[in-house]
Design a protein with these regions (language model features):
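Contiguous, well-folded functional domains in the mature portion of proteins
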Residues: 1-162
Length: 162
């Protein structure tokens, strides 16, 4: 399902928790918007769902990053935790494969928050429109506060007209 309106296309929270600005992330590659622009979520639950409808474009080798390209060509990146690449996949259980078509709210992964807390990882999950896709975005609106996975809109974008 695709949503279009004057206010823009919604991107829902892929994980329940509290949405903060990307500038609040304690990792310069995200807070500096090097990879893209968006928000971050401090998770309260480990169930991760698709924030947009589209096709899974990649899954990081360590299972901590997921990309979904929407049917309008805009790519959203979900990065599960900060420094979690060092877990080498431990604590992440993918529910999709690259090339899978997903709808908003479809399960894409489960992350073991207790394991990550025990190993003292920062659980903050950046959710960004990738730098390459930002060239196709005319306007991006970011929304912060409490969020429910698959339900709460955390961003809206207006694509550049072709």
């Amino acid at each position: 399902m695709m949503f279009f309106s004057e206010r823009g296309t919604p991107v829902v929270a892929p994980i329940s928790g509290h949405v903060v600005t990307i500038g609040d992330v304690d990792e310069p590659i995200f807070s500096g918007r090097v990879i893209g622009d968006g928000v971050a979520i401090v998770p309260s639950d480990g169930k991760v769902v698709a924030p947009i409808s589209g096709v899974v474009s990649f899954i990081g080798e360590q299972k901590h990053t997921y990309g979904i390209v929407g049917y309008d060509g805009i790519e959203v990146l979900i990065h599960l935790g900060i420094g979690t690449v060092r877990l080498e996949g431990e604590g992440f259980t993918p529910a999709v494969q690259v090339g899978a078509k997903v709808e908003v709210g479809a399960p894409i992964c489960t992350m073991d928050l207790e394991l990550m807390r025990a190993k003292q990882f920062d659980l903050t999950c950046p959710v960004v429109i990738t730098s390459a896709a930002m060239d196709k975005v005319k306007r991006l609106t970011l929304l912060t506060g409490p969020a429910l996975a698959g339900q709460t809109v955390c961003m809206r974008y207006v694509p550049v007209k072709a």
